[in-house]
Structures are given as structure tokens and as C-alpha cells.
Amino acid sequence: MLKNDLFLRALKRQPCSRTPIWVMRQAGRYLPEYRAIREKTDFLTLCKTPELAMEVTIQPVELMGVDAAIIFSDILVVNEAMGMDVEIIETKGIKLTPPIRSQADINRLIIPEVQDKLGYVLDAIRLTKKVLDNRVPLIGFSGAAWTLFTYAVEGGGSKNYAFAKKMMYREPKMAHMLLSKISAVISEYVCAQVEAGADAIQIFDSWASALSEDDYREFALPYIKENVQAVKAKYPDVPVIVFSKDCNTILSEIADTGCDAVGLGWGIDIKKARTILGDRVCLQGNMDPTVLYGTPEKIKAEAAKVLRQFGQHTAQSGHVFNLGHGILPDVDPANLKLLVEFVKEESAKYH
């Protein structure tokens, strides 16, 4: 039995004594303890060494007091497992070779045996669950098909997604073939993470806002739905969070994927999101990450505002406090600790 199951209760919209909190990228460069480990190893080796991945996954639980851990990994492990060469230099960027731009390139990508090619993530989950010893739930995750598609076609990050969109608009069938191939791997991968012990899954569509509403409906949402339903078919009680960054105009359709929670960027008032969605899903978010550069008073004021805007809980509501995107690497860890403690204290009155 979990000693602290608030995060899972909120996702399932069950009564909670307060609002649970975790933050995206909570295991990362803002923590000196993380940097000490990173000094001795490169990023992908850290992801691929279960003992180290476990250690950095648990750091924010012990140091910051967050209500959930998220397994330390990277969304691009899926691209690598499919046969792409992935180079991640934390300060300089990402390079994937060769970029996928033709039918022959797509054919060359493999549908990997997840237990084999991504076994190190599953081992890290098993080890982390053991060491966490039921203190808090563990989140598994994957990038969404559209986001992984953009990295594959662009060969890295991009400002305007020209190659990805060129394929979408000139060769839509080819684009769907690649998206479908990536999505099949994601579905298998997230189910394997649950099997290994993950208590919840988050799908990150980091580059969602690059698409128009109609294009998002065609090239992104169907695959997210496929991934959510894959988990639900096998593990109906495992909550799934969908974080389609800044897709504030189609929140209702994101909720229609069957997910348990919708992650929000900071560009929308959480009150407005709750008005749109009612209490049919849990909401996760959505403080601007740069608020953590502020004074203690400002951090508390902004956190209080998010809690106030979400408002009073009902028997069907759920809210997980988070940032609207990942914590920034140069934030003072003391500021996150302050935020976590404040949310724990301040949120009780809304429950």
C-alpha cells in the first residue's frame, strides 16, 4: 500500500485532504545532487544505468518532498530503440541521424522488442519502485507520436518544423505511416512501464502547439488516443495524463482521448480550463516555471492564485499542482522546496 497516494487519488478524482504536487523535470539540473552525478557520466548513460536513473528519480522526493516521482529518462529513447542514432548534449541540443524523410527511411526503422531495446528503463522502474518502498507513486512516460515524429524528420529540434510539415502537406500518407509506426512502439512501451511497476503514465506532446487545430486533430490526437486506449485496455485502473502543451483551444477533444488528466501550460487560466472541461478529468498544472525566479512572496502569491483559480473541490474534481512546463535548470532548489511546502499547506482549505 502506498503511504502517500494523494497524486493517484487526485488523478482518479477521488477526495483528497490537499492538492498533490510534483513538477516536470523535477529530477534535473537545478539540483546540485543531480549535477554531481552528471559530472561523472553523460546524459544517455545516466538514462541507461538503472542504479543512477533510480538515484536521480528519487532525489526530488527526498529533497523537495514532492508527492510523486517520475522515472528519469528521455522521450528520445523511443527513436533510438527504432534504429536512429541519438545524440543529446544537454547544453547544446539534440541530433538524430539519419533524419527520416523518405519511404525507404521509414521502412528502415524497426518496431523494437521493447523488453530488449528499452529494458534499461523497465529495470530502472523496477529498481526505483523497490527503493521508493511505497513512499509515493512512480510516473512512467513517453513522448507523443507527433513530438517524436518531429524529432525524427527534422533530425533534432526545430524552430519552424519545415521538414516535418513538408512531409505532412506533401506526403500525408507517408506522414501517417511514420506516425503510426512510432505510435505502435509508444503503446507497447507505456504498457511495459506499467507492467514494470509504474503507477501512472504521462504522454508528453511538447511540440503540440506547432500544429493548427485541424492538423492537430489529424496528425496528433488519433495517436494519443491510441496510446491512452492501449493502457486502458490492459490496465483500466492506471491513470493516464496527456500534456499537449498549449493546445488550449481543443482541451475538450484532448479529454475525449479517454485520459484521466489533462496537463495545462501556463497560457490558460486554470479556472477557464475547469469551466471548459467541468470535472470530467483531473487538471494538472499550471504555474509559469519562471515564477520560481521570483521572491518567496511572489512564488507564494502565484501558487495561491492557481489554487484559488481552480477553486473549491467537489466530489468529482481533481487537481494536481504542477508547472506549465519543466522546471528551469538555473532555478534555486530552495524556491521549489518553498513552493512544495506552500502548496501542501495552502491547498487544504479548498478540499
From Swiss-Prot:
Keywords linked to the UniProt accession: Cytoplasm, Decarboxylase, Lyase, Porphyrin biosynthesis
UniProt superkingdom: Bacteria
UniProt xrefs under SUPFAM superfamilies: UROD/MetE-like
Membrane-spanning intervals of the chain: none
Entry's Gene Ontology BP terms: protoporphyrinogen IX biosynthetic process
EC supergroup of this enzyme: lyase
UniProt binding sites for substrate: 25-29, 74, 151, 206, 325
A single GO molecular function term of this UniProt record: uroporphyrinogen decarboxylase activity
Example of a GO cellular component annotation carried by this entry: cytosol
InterPro entries noted in UniProt: UROD/MetE-like_sf, Uroporphyrinogen_deCO2ase_HemE, Uroporphyrinogen_deCOase
Reaction equation(s) it catalyzes: uroporphyrinogen III + 4 H(+) = coproporphyrinogen III + 4 CO2
Pfam families referenced in this protein's UniProt entry, alphabetically: URO-D (PF01208)
Subcellular location: Cytoplasm
Subunit structure: Homodimer.
Function of the protein: Catalyzes the decarboxylation of four acetate groups of uroporphyrinogen-III to yield coproporphyrinogen-III.
Family: Belongs to the uroporphyrinogen decarboxylase family.
Name of this chain's protein: Uroporphyrinogen decarboxylase
The organism of origin for this protein: Chlorobium luteolum (strain DSM 273 / BCRC 81028 / 2530)
Gene name tied to this protein: hemE
